[in-house]
Design a protein with these regions (language model features):
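Histidine-centered nuclease catalytic patch
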Residues: 75, 433, 445-454
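Glycine- and hydrophobic-rich flexible loops that cap the catalytic core of alpha/beta enzyme folds
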Residues: 2-265, 367
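Positively charged, low-complexity intrinsically disordered regions
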Residues: 109-111, 127, 433, 439, ...
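Short, solvent-exposed coil/turn linker segments
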Residues: 6-11, 405, 411, 448, ...
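Charged, solvent-exposed alpha-helical segments that act as regulatory interaction surfaces
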Residues: 95-98, 362, 445
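Amphipathic repeat-derived elements
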Residues: 41-47, 55-60, 393-401, 408, ...
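A cross-family structural signal marking well-folded subdomains
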Residues: 211-216, 220-443
Length: 454
């Protein structure tokens, strides 16, 4: 590892230089406020005649795929933002909406810092962002009608475009200010420096990364670029889509049924890392397992297994909004898909859990006990089933009925009394909606997941 102070603009410069934002990095997410602050700092640099402005650190590592290509481990937000600023400056000069004392300034910036005109089309840009951002960036080099308006890159490019038009600085002053941005460049060596450990230390506060971000970095970061892209496309991106991008919660549920305890949401990354290392997991096999469970997660959330009876119960459980039971449902449905329990046992198990949840809700039993119950319920059931060489469903029912204290299963008498005494219109809205669904559709032959009740 080698660190040195240098001008930020030097990272974009040079023959065959191309900066790669690895697929494990999050999308570009600097806000307009961040861009405003940068531009204000550049104005201040010139107005106060300062020699330079410190702009943070950048961590980069040469890739195995190509000479001159560097992978940006940390600092992609700053690098991308300044690239957008230079592109906005170039386009305004080329459109002759602003002028420069140097008639070649636009071309000089374009060929030195933005594009390598000698490279093939797919490698021409000196910056390669992650998948969706890359498409947006390429369109910014085209006409405005081609811009990807939903992209944050486009929004910030437009901000710079308009801000430059205000001419607080001339084109020459702005470029001079950009050249004064200083960074600490930390260069890592393949095979010698652990990029993951360095990234962790730089982001130890965890303020700007979700637990899922950190897990994604962990599983992808130390892989060659082509392997990263393959793992991202074949597994991680599918996991994101299947979980509706709520990957941190999904990972917590995955860990819960594997660890048989509920990790704190802010500790999901650390728990995942320990789990992976303890089991000496092959990364691709681990991602494949996660992707498979993410498909089950999607089917649970959407009540879309394709089996009508199963989907009806899942739909009702979704009405109750009891996400706490997912650490039980995920391995249960997986067990069924592996033909380790039959369809009858699956339906029966789902209905037993449904009854358990609704009875407790009607009797106003505390919900804080449910986390621990469902963290271990599947493993408890499997253990007793194997020990007694008996069926899954009777064992599951036995475990729930014999829970004690705050975890117990309400008796018939308790449930009936609560049902008689409860003010239905004052109860939990999800439980009320569930109750109306059951009363109205008890014998309904047509199943629809989009029913609504007022």
């Amino acid at each position: 590892m080698k660190g040195s102070e240098k001008r930020l603009i030097s990272l974009y410069d040079g023959s065959n230089v191309r900066m790669i934002i690895p697929v494990y990095q999050r999308n570009y997410d600097w806000t307009r406020d961040n861009c405003r602050q940068l531009f204000d700092d550049l104005v201040s640099l010139i107005k106060n005649n300062r020699q330079n402005h410190f702009f943070g650190s950048v961590v980069e590592m040469g890739t195995q795929e190509g000479i001159g290509e560097v992978s940006i481990i940390d600092g992609q937000q700053r690098i991308t933002t300044v690239y957008l600023l230079m592109l906005a400056l170039v386009k305004l000069l080329e459109e002759e909406k602003i002028t420069s004392a140097d008639p070649q300034l636009a071309r000089r910036i374009r060929v030195s810092y933005l594009e390598d005109e000698f490279q093939p089309e797919d490698k021409k840009l000196r910056l390669k962002p992650v998948k969706n951002d890359e498409m947006a960036l390429k369109r910014l080099f085209k006409d405005e009608k081609d811009y990807l308006l939903s992209s944050n890159l486009t929004n910030n490019f437009r901000y710079f475009y308009e801000r430059i038009l205000d001419q607080e600085l001339t084109a020459d002053e702005l470029f001079k200010a950009i050249q004064k941005l200083m960074i600490i460049d930390i260069s890592l060596k393949q095979g010698e420096d652990d990029a993951q450990l360095i990234f962790e230390s730089l982001n130890s506060t965890g303020l700007d990364l979700t637990e899922a971000d950190k897990v994604r970095n962990y599983v992808l970061m130390n892989q060659p670029v082509k392997v990263q892209e393959s793992l991202y496309e074949n597994y991680w991106n599918k996991i994101e889509v299947n979980t509706n991008y709520e990957v941190s919660n999904f990972l917590r549920n995955y860990l819960t049924f594997n660890l048989k305890r509920v990790p704190k949401i802010q500790k999901v990354y650390l728990e995942f890392k320990k789990y992976s290392e303890k089991n000496d997991s092959d990364i691709e096999e681990l991602l494949s397992d996660l992707e498979r469970y993410s498909e089950i997660n999607r089917d649970i959330s959407n009540a879309s297994t394709g089996e009508r009876e199963v989907d009806e119960v899942l739909h009702r459980l979704n009405i109750l909004d009891m996400r706490v039971i997912k650490p039980f449902l995920l391995p249960l449905i997986n067990y069924w898909k592996l033909n380790k329990i039959d369809f009858k046992a699956l339906i029966g198990s789902l209905k037993v859990v449904e009854t358990f949840i609704f009875r407790r809700t009607m009797c106003s039993f505390p919900t804080n006990a449910l986390n621990k119950i469902f963290a271990t319920l599947f493993s408890e059931t499997i253990k007793l089933t194997n020990q007694g060489n008996t069926e899954f469903l009777p064992v599951l029912s036995y475990i729930l009925i014999n829970k004690a204290d705050s975890s117990r299963y309400p008796k018939d008498s308790e449930f009936l009394k609560s049902f008689d005494d409860k003010d239905i219109y004052d109860m939990n809205k999800n439980a009320r909606k569930y109750l109306f669904d059951r009363l109205e559709n008890r014998n309904c032959q047509i199943f629809c997941v989009n029913r609504s009740f007022s």
